[in-house]
A protein has these predicted regions:
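N-terminal hydrophobic targeting/anchoring segments and the immediately downstream early-domain regions
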Residues: 2-25, 142-158, 163
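Histidine/acidic residue-rich metal-binding segments in metalloenzymes
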Residues: 16-20, 24-120, 126-141
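Short, ordered loop/turn segments at secondary-structure junctions
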Residues: 69, 93-94, 121, 224, ...
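Hydrophobic/aromatic-rich, well-ordered segments within soluble, folded domains that form packed cores
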Residues: 85, 89-91, 308-322, 348, ...
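Short linear, low-complexity motifs centered on an aromatic residue
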Residues: 97-114, 132, 230, 237-239, ...
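Short, intrinsically disordered, low-complexity segments enriched in Ser/Thr and Pro
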Residues: 108-142, 252, 375-377, 502-511, ...
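Glycine-rich, acidic/polar active-site loops that bind/position phosphate-bearing ligands
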Residues: 144-329, 338-341, 348-591
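C-terminal amphipathic alpha-helical interaction region
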Residues: 525-730
Length: 730
């Protein structure tokens, strides 16, 4: 056989050194947002009256007046050209889970045979991409392709290389959202209105409530050479075969361990570029699995945080290649070790500085705290199936439910103290005051260690939606997902719950009941109603699946079936009542989700079939031929009895290889047949279910046979980099 690519790339990987990264001379605080059109730059480059009106649009949601657009565009162009920019693009988030952009140059004919740089308000505010070329669920056909991208002033413009990037929404000519940003902005507006209304029961001066989001991005890094020798990684983002390494994460020595030099250089480079783009990176560390890492920023306003996460994922891929790596954002790139998630820390902040999910110092403040906790639980309880659908994907399904990630059942962990408080409110006399214990100190009896302040909420890593002191942590979101999907459903559901709460309180007050008494009455009803969503136990246990089913929670795990929750009557009613999405938009999104699911599984099945027939079987039969020659040589040299004894092991291996390759060939034929049958199903929903039920199980069977062969075939013949090489060469 020709030279084994695997050994060549392994040898090259060992020779690679950390790329030197020159840090800027300025402090991070000085180069932060260097390539962002910040308020300070707006103030410098815009006329005073235009600046004031634009800030009003950003801060108070007033409608953008087209009359100021030209002045804003001119100021942006002037700043951008001083930064060496030559092009601009509307940067948006179609339903592909990535970002999209088309670059146009500033230059135009000047009418005198030359060129001049121009950028008008019209070009800033609106463009017309071809909507039929993006996933749209049938909303746009090729013969009616017009769509609009429209500037989102609340997310600042930024520069990548020589291009001015303008964050935009993307909608159809008929007005339906074809992206993630448009419904996210609607959901944030809905939760702002609803939370402000409820807030005013406690703080009449509150005029606005902001949703904040802090995400934690997990990822794997793999040497680029090793990656290029694994067609499955290149084409699907995960390994479709590969026996577990003898050592993986069982020693618990990678989590928070020393960061390898090459990885440290990558992280440093990434953070510098991220900070220059205004992404406030805060934390970096090794994660649990080998070659798995995490990056987390300081929390930001939700819409901006989502934009920054999408920008960061794109930046990670670019910087990784510079350092000889490929970044893997797939939720489960390797079997047998932890996958990657993206925890979303979600909170609400009133404009008077009050964190609405944080305990207060007075009974009234604690009543506000309990109100927002309970109504968030009501939202999660009513729409637990929808929230699961919002985080489900063909890729994340491989991670959820394993003993490494939250289960595919949405529940909420509150901690002992808060659970006891809600039980107390439910049963006690409502005239009793709400007194939460403050943070308590913990003496460790070690002189050199200061007293620790212990939070009065514990941690439950198995909970998908956990309260962590002043916010909720939504842990089920996948590492490569657009967080907007989960944030749209969560914020819309919370808005509905808060609206419902305020309406019931108002009705009681209209009947003459005291306001605080009315609040407590409604809360007590809701505490009873949403009790099934509260679970502080082990989410990994089989008992919990049975218990969750008894509680009426959604225990479905089939990805295509879970997507149906978007079209449940209560989901449609919730989205329409909050004006986040209408039925047509929801139906279109589900079409896209089912189609994306089918395509991802289809690609994996094709790649697995190709590798099985063109890599695994030839390599295995080549080794089998060597064994056959060895047996024949034994029989030529030794007397029959001795030859039989000495060649018995090889004969067994020859037989096992023959049987396993025969099974692989038959399974690949079955896999191809299952795909063909599924592909003939016209209804995309039914086709997705067919892929889940008939195609995916056959892929698992093929993998089992291949992984067994990997442990038999001579290492020198195996052409695909093994797990030990992918995970431990850094």
């Amino acid at each position: 056989m020709s030279e084994n690519l695997r050994f060549r790339v392994v040898e090259e990987a060992f020779k690679k050194k950390a790329v030197e990264v020159a840090a800027p001379k300025e402090r991070p605080s000085e180069y932060f947002a260097k390539y962002v059109f910040t308020r300070q730059k707006m103030y410098k480059y815009l006329p005073a009256d235009v600046y004031e009106r634009l800030i009003d649009v950003i801060d108070h949601g007033t409608r953008l007046d087209r009359s100021i657009a030209d002045a804003v565009a001119e100021g942006m162009k002037q700043w951008a050209m001083e930064m060496g920019v030559t092009h601009y693009t509307h940067w948006f988030q179609p339903l592909t889970e990535g970002t999209a952009e088309k670059h146009d140059a500033f230059v135009e004919h000047d009418g005198k045979g030359g060129m001049v740089e121009k950028f008008s308000g019209k070009l800033l505010v609106q463009q017309e991409p071809d909507a039929s070329s993006f996933p749209n669920g049938g909303i746009r056909n090729t013969f009616e392709a017009r769509g609009y991208s429209a500037w989102d002033p609340t997310s600042p413009v930024f520069i990548i290389d020589d291009t001015l990037c303008i964050p935009t929404i993307f909608i159809a000519y008929t007005g339906e959202a074809l992206d993630y940003k448009a419904p996210l902005l609607r959901a944030l507006h809905a939760v702002d209105k609803a939370a402000t209304s409820v807030c005013q029961l406690f703080y009449p001066e509150v005029k606005k409530v902001t949703c904040n989001l802090g995400w934690e991005q997990e990822y794997f890094l793999v040497d680029e050479g090793l990656y290029s020798a694994r067609p499955d990684l290149m084409l699907t983002g995960r390994t479709l075969m590969g026996h577990e390494s003898a050592k993986n994460q069982q020693m618990d020595d990678h989590y928070f361990g020393t960061i390898p030099d090459r990885v440290q250089a990558f992280m440093k480079d990434l953070e510098i570029q991220a900070l220059e783009l205004g992404i406030p990176c805060k934390t970096r560390h090794n994660e649990v699995a080998p070659n798995q890492f995490e990056l987390a920023p300081i929390y930001e306003e939700c819409n901006l945080a989502v934009d920054h996460n999408m920008l960061l994922m794109s930046l990670m891929k670019k910087v990784a290649r510079k350092h000889g790596f490929r970044v893997l954002l797939h939720e489960k790139p390797f079997d047998g070790i932890n996958g990657s998630g993206k925890h979303n820390n979600w909170s609400l902040l009133a404009d008077n500085g009050t964190l609405l999910h944080a305990p207060g110092k007075t009974p009234e403040e604690n009543l506000r705290f309990v109100t927002f906790i309970v109504e968030t639980l009501m939202a999660v309880y009513r729409h637990n199936g929808l929230l699961k659908a919002s985080i489900m994907s063909a890729t994340n399904a491989h991670r959820l439910g394993g003993n490494e990630a939250p289960p595919a059942i949405i529940s909420s962990f509150l901690g002992k103290q808060l659970s006891e408080l809600l039980d107390h409110i439910e049963k006690a006399d409502k005239d009793e005051l709400f007194n939460l214990k403050g943070k308590q100190g913990m003496e460790l009896d070690i002189p050199q260690i200061p007293e620790l302040i212990i939070d009065n909420t514990d941690r439950n890593r198995t909970s998908p939606f956990a309260f962590t002191g002043n916010r909720f942590e939504f842990r089920a979101i996948g590492s490569e997902a657009n967080s907007a999907s989960a944030m749209i459903s969560l914020n819309a559901a919370v808005a509905e719950a808060l609206n419902n709460f305020r309406q019931r309180v108002d009705r009681l007050c209209e009947k003459g009941e005291d306001k605080m008494s009315a609040i407590i009455d409604v809360l007590r009803d809701d505490i009873k109603t949403c009790k099934p969503i509260r679970f502080d136990g082990n989410g990994y246990s089989e008992e919990w699946v049975e218990e969750a089913s008894r509680r009426g929670l959604d225990t479905e795990s089939s990805c295509p079936v879970v997507f149906e929750r978007y079209l449940d009557s209560q989901s449609i009613a919730m989205f329409e009542s909050t004006k986040v999405m209408n039925r047509k938009e929801l139906e279109a999104r589900n079409e896209v989700k089912w189609e994306t699911y089918v395509k991802k599984v289809q690609i994996e099945a094709r790649v697995l079939g190709d590798l099985s027939m063109n890599h695994i079987i030839p390599v295995s039969t080549h080794y089998q031929s060597q064994l056959i020659r060895n047996v024949q040589s034994m029989k030529a040299i030794f007397e029959p009895v001795k030859a039989d004894r000495l060649s018995a092991r090889n004969l067994k291996l020859i037989e096992e290889i023959a049987e396993r390759t025969e099974r692989i060939e038959a399974l690949v034929e079955d896999l191809t047949s299952a795909r063909r049958i599924a592909n003939r199903i016209d209804d995309i929903h039914s086709r997705a279910i067919s892929y889940h039920d008939t195609v995916e199980p056959k892929m698992e069977s093929i993998r089992h046979e291949i992984d067994s062969l990997e442990m038999i075939v001579e290492d020198g013949l195996w052409t695909l980099p093994k797990y030990r090489e992918l995970l431990f060469i850094r």
